[in-house]
Amino acid sequence: MESSPTSRYIIVAEKASVARAIKDALKSINGEFTVTNVSGHLLDLDLPDEYRNWWAVKPESIIRLRRLNHVIRDEESYQRLKRIFMENNGVLVIATDNDHEGELIGSEILSLYRSIRGEDAPFKRMRFNSTAKSELLESWGRLEDDLNWRWVEKARLRQAFDLITGAAFTRLLTLSTKRRNKNVNLISWGSCQIPTLYFVVKREKEIMSFKPTKYWYLRATLETAKGEKFTAYSQHLYEQKVAEELHSRAVNNNIATVKTFRTSLKTQYRPLPSRTDDVLRDLARLTRIAASKLLSMMETLYSEGYISYPRTDTNKYPQNFRFDAGLKATIEGGIVRERTERPPRPRQGKLDDGAHPPIFPVAPYMGSGILRKIWEYIAKRFYANAYCDDAEIAGQDAEIMIGDVELRARGSYVSSPGFYSVFDYFKPSENRLPQLTPGQSLRIVSVELVEDETKPPPRLSESELLREMEKNNIGTDATRASFPTLIAERGYVERKSGVYIPTMLGQTLIDSLELTDSRLVTPATRRTIEEVMNAIERGELKYSDALDNAAKIYEDLLIKCLGDIDNVAKKLSEAFQKSGDQRPKRRYRRYR
């Protein structure tokens, strides 16, 4: 977009650092630019004033609400923008993040702008995926004439739905329990946080109900003529007498014989381009830092110009993607020593959210600490995906006979490192067997009879919990990371040694609601709501119809819960009494 000397623009970004980057990028362009920013949402939804008194309003009337109030959420930004719009006559350019929430924030800015300048006041939409100067200049050259109103409506639906359902259920549970126990502060309910908690409780139940089964096996240490030692094992045996008999037949031998030896090669594919969910799962596993904090740090790297936009569900590069900038950042950031001569050949995924490319490095980050670790992961994954070969793993399988007793030895090693030479985070450990040949004799060093028992499944780590949430369509790539932290803040779970353990309160909440109706806690109900929201984005549903459809599903469940609330409240009150300092602090908003 060419700017004449008399062109005037008011550019509003979503973050101060992004505003600074835009201001710097546009220095070489003719025109008068007022560049400012908000700090997230300008406005928020709230219940009408007559619904403020928790004790005076029936919960079922809240979930039927369709007339909601817009309230100022960021007073400082609101007043600053209002003053700028009144004092400047430039054309508004909305430069918020290029996603659903960014679009909704853009509509809030536009609403304030047109309330001052008139309903026909002109505006433009600026879209970009990184704050690199070259991309911002390109973005300025292709300003759009309108917002994506389907994105706005989808984000608005999520906001309204979460408010009316969360407020209705939270008030019902809190007030009913408080009648029995005055010390109760808040029993928070949200259609995403409850299924997230359900996964943790479900796993805990599997662990607690697990009944171990004893088994036995033979473990033989063997040695080749060259002095190479390795271990072979029998299959698991569930009868002790059979195991003891097998051991007695094997232990009297001095020589074992190789029956078969096979080596097979398996391709280990290089990682797909980085999307939010994959990156957060890996980084949570590697750093043991909460995904919500990791995402916040990724946003810092983005807003300061080191990586592209970090909230994306895309794992395939567009055909016209320019790899040079990412490669340059990777080299200058010390990930690889010299520029490769081979052209980019990315392994492509199948997902494209239509808004952003995969996450990639934009500029070298030479700082230290967790920010450096995050940047390194993104840069290494970018290079491994686009410029490295797949790896190859050799699997070894040997059948060993000790008399008539058959044992098995398995080994593996990296036969061709490929991308592991750069992206080495999950490189498999090697357990290489010596090269064996059928008929080869081996010296038996020892044969032991080992007793063991089956183990319960492990508790969920944050990485595994995020995987469960994505698999069941709980939340989005932009919101999913917040829910594990949220249920911990509510006092429903504790995070110990990197895994989640439900508190008595959290387990009681899930158990009591599940007895009332399993749809209150299982992910299938929320998954249906996500489908309704996606229908808005596809243009198949209007906002009002979508909200009616979504709210009706939970209204029916609320009525069901009302019918059993005495039982639910009794159990929750007892859990509160026993849990003591696990009680969450009272919060009125952010029902999700």
Predicted features and spans:
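Conserved short loop/turn motifs at secondary-structure junctions
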Residues: S7-R8, D97-D99, N183-L186, T263-L272, ...
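Amphipathic alpha-helical transducer elements in NTP-driven molecular machines
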Residues: A16-R20, V35, S39, V71-K82, ...
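Structured, non-catalytic alpha/beta "coupling" segments that mediate domain-domain communication
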Residues: R20-R52, I194-V242, A386-R432
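C-terminal or mid-to-C-terminal helical accessory/interaction module adjacent to the motor/catalytic core
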Residues: R73, Q79, E87, T131-A220, ...
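Metal- or metallocofactor-binding catalytic centers and their adjacent structured scaffolds
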Residues: Q240-P273, L280
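Intrinsically disordered, low-complexity regulatory segments
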Residues: M1-Q159, L163-A167, V445
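Basic, low-complexity terminal or inter-domain segments flanking catalytic cores
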Residues: E2-I10, L112, T170, A290-S292, ...
